[in-house]
Amino acid sequence: MAVETIQKPETTTKRKIAPRYRVLLHNDDFNPMEYVVMVLMQTVPSLTQPQAVDIMMEAHTNGTGLVITCDIEPAEFYCEQLKSHGLSSSIEPDD
């Protein structure tokens, strides 16, 4: 009796890279600049004061400033935290 060996086809599994999202700070005419910098640093602990100042100035000058690019869950968290402190923020896909 002959034994037949069945070869298992080789499969490669590639992980799909999770999409990234941009957290944006929008300019407003209500909050003092120092307050915006403080909230940015409290919300995103990895930000230094000079980085927070740059983000605030970018929003002040151009209408929006890029706070951070990250996965969807932290992006939603950062956006909601900024909003809870009275700042205007949104998220968008990073292309």
Curated annotation (Swiss-Prot):
Domain of life: Bacteria
Protein name: ATP-dependent Clp protease adapter protein ClpS
PANTHER family cross-referenced by the UniProt entry: ATP-DEPENDENT CLP PROTEASE ADAPTER PROTEIN CLPS (PTHR33473:SF19), ATP-DEPENDENT CLP PROTEASE ADAPTER PROTEIN CLPS1, CHLOROPLASTIC (PTHR33473)
One Pfam family recorded for the sequence: ClpS
The protein's role, per its UniProt record: Involved in the modulation of the specificity of the ClpAP-mediated ATP-dependent protein degradation.
BP terms from Gene Ontology: protein catabolic process; proteolysis
Homology family: Belongs to the ClpS family.
HAMAP family referenced in this protein's UniProt entry, alphabetically: ClpS
Subunit structure: Binds to the N-terminal domain of the chaperone ClpA.
